[in-house]
């Protein structure tokens, strides 16, 4: 195929909206600074003579109209590097089995609200508690506490009560759908539920009503889980500022919850729901869980379907659970994971979990440099791992320009919301700081195409480097933001479990992360369960009214 003699290109092509006149050598010379390259005057003249054709190609694509947000690029990211077999896993158990023992159902409704999924599920099956009563407990807490927390965008009380009554009736008829049967939860407001507002946390979309239902919601519905409503999300999945408010940290109402799974972390930590759905592109589960004292599991890329969920970066977005206890993440992941034809990046790899299995003998990768600024709570986790019989293996990653891994995030997000920028609707966004999305989308238009491809090649290098490291260990242990591994592992697709840490046993002091091999979330859950039992046996409760 050639570009010569195209019959529709007689004369000067349409350069597209916003392009005034021909591209000149002087324009190209100024643009060279953006690309970090230099051409001669003669080269610039030759380029300028041929640029109209290139700009015309772009303009004709724009005239197609807005592309739907859920239309993924033709090239689909796979976390498993080509030629590599699946990593071994250390778990074989059924993640749907309720582990641990539940005592009597407490009389105090606050104690019920902060109970684990396993405890709630046991009480419901004993007949000590109904889903309808539990749902009402959470709805009352939302009514009372959300005016301070601003963690809910839409409360679906009527739908929740209908689901709760149906769950109770099904259980009474002998139909048990597993640990999540009758358990109330919140869904981050980038997740669609047909007929319900899904605002993406952004003013331009505040009146958007979903016309389809996300796969994750369909799967939770099938388990008779009860959706309480849509949790606050930083606008277009960044930060904790949404179109009406700033979601608050339940431990410090003067502070934002971080984000972008802002309301999911805040509401779960505050006992407004038993669990929630979050998402992460670059820190959006890990960061708010650290801030709010919640537990979060970012699954392997492709493990959980994104169909019916707002796309920010098609090759980076991941859906995962936020809970108050580690084993609860296993129950939720077991329900929502699995192959989905609606999501081209979805994969079908079995998920197993043995949370009660001892961690003795597990190989834990770490590096002293990762803990140079660590606090006592972080070092206590390392001590626990050693006492429990883990083999500590010092590891390191090669020196690479890891910041290049941000380029796909910038480019994909700007593409996902191109029309927002072109139509000047980005001006409607509440957060307009230099680091906020409106400015990031605008400057991403100046990423050179060659640089976008080269950054993707650096991403392949990162995948290979992580694969070599994970051949030596079963998991990595580190503070959440150490050594750039939050960025690296989001780019490579590796799973991460984040746990709250506490210096005094009653208030969160930060968080700790375990990074696992691809599709081996079960090992992370074993580790997290062991750390909880050894260091944090009590659920942290914010001092709310």
Show where each model-derived region lies:
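Acyltransferase
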Residues: 128, 133-139, 165, 169, ...
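Mature N-terminal segment immediately following signal peptide/propeptide cleavage
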Residues: 21-49
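Gly/Ser-rich, acidic/histidine-flanked active-site/gating loops
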Residues: 106, 110-116, 146, 182, ...
